[in-house]
């Protein structure tokens, strides 16, 4: 997801669940955004040539079970992340992409061969943050055939109609059918169609569920999520 979509918070929460006494969990970050005693954290320092790639290379000598890379920004970091995964380590990282299937094309743009992506990628999660309706002033929509509520505004929410935020998630788990579509210059739309056929819930679909539950508005969901496809009635083309 983009900057400010909650990727770091989700990543740390996931790692905290995995960090037990038996697990050696190491991170390379720029900067270290949350100090966590259960992790072995390393900060990138360009003035001494400690980059993401060189940091991963150093961590591989420390017998880690899980490696977290703050962000994959360049080819060298991507290649080292793949190398770590190929040697039996569980690797977590973040990428700036619009949705989950686009992560595959992004890795290819960074120079990672398609067969290496097939061999190492387990899954991708895209996310966005959506504003929640204020529980003190929201009201049901007037239309009889419409589910959900609308924003009003009160002193509790400073007349914005919203209070708090929640995550929208799109999780794409790699299976043989999706792996078969990971080819040189992979078609992102073909990957998306197959993932949806396999049961993936898109960011927009996740948002619509929150609208139906009266937690947010359709306007808010359309603001933060990309369109799904031409076959979706709520598709908004670029």
What are these regions (language model features)?
Residues 1-238:
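Short, flexible helix-loop junctions that flank or precede catalytic/ligand sites
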């Amino acid at each position: 997801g983009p900057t400010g979509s909650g990727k770091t918070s989700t990543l740390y929460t996931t790692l905290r669940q995995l960090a037990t006494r038996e697990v050696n969990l190491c991170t390379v970050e720029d900067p270290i955004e949350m100090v966590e005693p259960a992790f072995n954290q390393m900060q990138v320092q360009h003035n001494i040539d400690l980059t993401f790639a060189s940091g991963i290379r150093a961590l591989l000598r420390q017998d880690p079970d899980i490696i977290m890379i703050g962000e994959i920004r360049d080819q060298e970091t991507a290649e080292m992340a793949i190398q770590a995964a190929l040697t039996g380590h569980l690797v977590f990282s973040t990428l700036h992409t619009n949705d989950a299937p686009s992560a595959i094309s992004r890795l290819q743009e960074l120079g990672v061969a398609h067969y290496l992506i097939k061999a190492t990628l387990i899954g991708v999660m895209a996310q966005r943050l959506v504003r929640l309706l204020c529980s003190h002033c929201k009201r049901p929509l007037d239309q009889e055939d419409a589910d959900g509520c609308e924003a009003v505004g009160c002193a509790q929410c400073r007349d914005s109609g919203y209070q708090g935020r929640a995550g929208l998630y799109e999780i794409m788990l790699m299976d043989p059918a999706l792996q078969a579509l990971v080819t040189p210059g992979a078609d992102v739309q073909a990957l998306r169609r197959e993932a949806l056929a396999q049961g993936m819930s898109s960011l927009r679909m996740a948002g619509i569920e929150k609208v139906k539950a009266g937690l947010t508005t359709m306007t808010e969901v359309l603001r933060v999520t990309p369109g799904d496809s031409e076959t979706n009635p709520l598709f908004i083309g670029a």
